[in-house]
Amino acid sequence: MWLIVGLGNPGETYARTRHNIGFRVVTELAQRHHLRFTHKRAKAEIAEGEIAGQRVALALPQTYMNLSGQAVVGLRQWYKIDPATELLVVYDDVDLPFGVLRLRERGSAGTHNGMRSIVALLGSQVFPRLRIGIDRPPVAWNLADYVLARFTPEQEAQLPEVTRRAADALELVLREGIVVAMNRINAPPPKPEKKRGSETSDPSAESADHAGGG
């Protein structure tokens, strides 16, 4: 089975903040498959069911962001999963442009306190994660204030599309596996076709590394 955890802060005060986009995406996935958050265990709200032929538990930790690891470790023990192959964490990332998705099998927690808590309590960085870009804060902004603020009106208008693509990415992992999903999700967007008669570019001049950071 898969344990899919969306990171965020509980309560209406934080519901529409940048830091809660992980909650939004996992909630979108649950609604899409008519799964309801009817269980509470290990300091998290849980929706259980089946997606793409896989048993899943979708989790929204209720611990506040900085203590997310408490919920994840408790759920790992409850469901008896292997984090390296059966845990997928969804969260916001200030180091990615708004709306950009990155899927990884492992990596550091970076500056994200929720991920730091998970890595510390699991004792491992080896577990899949889907990062969703929320942009860097403006120079004058404190990072904590930025992630706990709402999106701009322009970004808010694009959020339904961003959450849809992120939920699609989670479905792809469940349907095709993490490696196939990474190859598709992390690939650069296709370049526009050149007009007939224009010079072709030298493919050797293009970088082969599109993976980005951990």
UniProtKB/Swiss-Prot annotation:
It comes from the Bacteria. The record marks 92 as: Stabilizes the basic form of H active site to accept a proton. Its EC number is 3.1.1.29. Keywords: Cytoplasm, Hydrolase, RNA-binding, tRNA-binding. TRNA binds at residues 14, 64, 66, 113. Residues 184-214 are annotated as: Disordered. It is an enzyme of class 3 (hydrolase). CDD domains: PTH. It catalyses: an N-acyl-L-alpha-aminoacyl-tRNA + H2O = an N-acyl-L-amino acid + a tRNA + H(+). GO terms for molecular function: peptidyl-tRNA hydrolase activity; tRNA binding. It is found in: Cytoplasm. InterPro entries: Pept_tRNA_hydro, Pept_tRNA_hydro_CS, Pept_tRNA_hydro_sf. GO terms for cellular component: cytoplasm. The record marks 9 as: Discriminates between blocked and unblocked aminoacyl-tRNA. Pfam families: Pept_tRNA_hydro. Its main location: cytoplasm. The active site is at residue 19. PROSITE patterns: PEPT_TRNA_HYDROL_2. Belongs to the PTH family. PANTHER family: PEPTIDYL-TRNA HYDROLASE. Monomer. This is Peptidyl-tRNA hydrolase. It comes from Roseiflexus castenholzii (strain DSM 13941 / HLO8).
